[in-house]
């Protein structure tokens, strides 16, 4: 193998398979491996182009006759929480987010397993074992963090480590933002809206770190599972002309955003 072939990413196309989001459609993905010294730079570049990371693979939809999957990123510094979002923040004011290295724990897996069993028992991740979970967390050649959300343990003082674990986010740190790779929570906490809370917390974290964006993955028009991503405004959506600004739940602005 030549030096050029080692340094140049190789892209592959998957065979068609049933789309998990839009009934009656087939999906295909183009993917490459994120390995070596240039993995971080490549992940940045590909994320800007609409790719997502899963372990050491970066992928994006490449469906034959469908372009429904649209990459979305929230403009962190301009985001202002709505009344409903402020209520979510208030309901979770007893939680503290602790950023850690991407190291899996049995405590995390217990929450992860309960989350899959209650929320996604028929999904593609339903059969993941503890070893599969460990691979999901550890198999990364880019800057990845775990954020654990725990009940605030006031009995041990204001600076004490949090108490019971209720939610977890696996997050990549990019040059221009935070990319939420996967998040999960205790499904018994039905009144907290923990998925929403973790996104709001990531927006606040990005703002504090001076990072302009929070990448949420794909918004898919017509998929109820993905409708929630359109509520975090202003945001940008990736189109053929580039990243287009969206001010309200509707069409994007006509001019691409840098």
UniProtKB/Swiss-Prot annotation:
Catalyzed chemical reaction(s): N-terminal L-glutamyl-[protein] + L-leucyl-tRNA(Leu) = N-terminal L-leucyl-L-glutamyl-[protein] + tRNA(Leu) + H(+); N-terminal L-aspartyl-[protein] + L-leucyl-tRNA(Leu) = N-terminal L-leucyl-L-aspartyl-[protein] + tRNA(Leu) + H(+)
Keywords of this entry: Acyltransferase, Cytoplasm, Transferase
Keyword Zinc-finger: no
Any one cellular-component term (Gene Ontology): cytoplasm
Any one Gene Ontology BP term: ubiquitin-dependent protein catabolic process via the N-end rule pathway
EC number in record: 2.3.2.29
GO MF annotation: an example: leucyl-tRNA--protein transferase activity
Tagged with keyword Zinc-finger: no
Record localization: Cytoplasm
InterPro entries: Acyl_CoA_acyltransferase, Asp_Glu_LeuTrfase, N-end_Aminoacyl_Trfase, N-end_Aminoacyl_Trfase_C, N-end_Aminoacyl_Trfase_N
SUPFAM superfamilies for this protein: Acyl-CoA N-acyltransferases (Nat)
Pfam families reported for this sequence: ATE_C, ATE_N
PANTHER family for this protein: ARGININE-TRNA-PROTEIN TRANSFERASE 1, ARGINYL-TRNA--PROTEIN TRANSFERASE 1
Family statement drawn from the similarity comment of this UniProt entry: Belongs to the R-transferase family. Bpt subfamily.
Family matches, as HAMAP family: Bpt
Function: Functions in the N-end rule pathway of protein degradation where it conjugates Leu from its aminoacyl-tRNA to the N-termini of proteins containing an N-terminal aspartate or glutamate.
Name this protein carries in UniProt: Aspartate/glutamate leucyltransferase
Species this chain originates from: Bradyrhizobium sp. (strain ORS 278)
Gene (UniProt): bpt
